[in-house]
């Protein structure tokens, strides 16, 4: 009996000790919107995730804005095999199926959400001012670039600039393009005057893209007005655009940004010989072809040099296969290149 009472007393003591403990429920492993980004490394990882969306779209290039724009233009012709209905329909500005570009829509909004998340949290990270401005500028550029492609392809797409938006509203054309232009202007203003060469965008990339977006919105897109109701006499391109922050962007300001890019960026056109832009003039093969041998040609990217004409390029490698890593190789080249050696 005494033994039983003694054991019960021990058990009661143990249970009392357990109930008096405080359970630490904080998750030290999983990253979420509540704890990420919190460090400089987190910010770098988050920015890499936004860039990764460029490769994600490359996994299914036939769904992308670039693919449709190329086939709809005079730059190339729709080809492929007899069963490539998707590509043939794009070439004729037709639908092959209802969700033919759905993957592009999903991918680009995923990239936008990643940009929103980083921009929402970057103020909570202790960063040097120049580093913070560079990261914030790159995130704003990429968000603007993704919206630019979506708006160019679909028109008035839902607009969200915060990761907390659950049901974003459909903006007017002026609101949507105002946000695109504001992001690009902000990126050009805050990023340091340092040219990037590692696949990242810089101040001058933002200035150039600002000019491109301005020309499309006030030119080809006719300020977002009803194209059917416009004529050459009734259409008047905008000379200023109201931005969401209450400021105004003028045509003269855009010209100033472009002039800064041309005069101060270090980017330039290759004027020596057009063929120097193409890889067949590299020092290992330039003498292999009758049309290049003995002509003093030199590829602009020989010896790891950077093409002076390239302001912004998606980074690819040669390691991708047909699995989930396919987007890390230039899958556009697979579609636009020579189909086979047999003719």
Short names for language-model regions:
Residues 1-8:
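Bacterial N-terminal signal peptides that target proteins for export
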Residues 10-14:
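Hydrophobic helical h-region of N-terminal Sec-dependent signal peptides
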Residues 17-20:
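C-terminal motif of bacterial Sec signal peptides marking the signal peptidase cleavage site
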Residues 22-84, 204, 212-343:
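An aromatic- and glycine-enriched ligand-binding surface/loop that stacks and positions planar moieties
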Residues 26, 151-161, 226:
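Short, well-structured active-site flanking segments
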Residues 35, 39-62, 80-154, 164-200:
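Conserved, well-structured interaction surfaces
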Residues 122, 162, 314-316:
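Active-site-proximal beta-strand/loop segments in catalytic clefts of secreted hydrolases
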Residues 143, 207-212:
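Core structural elements
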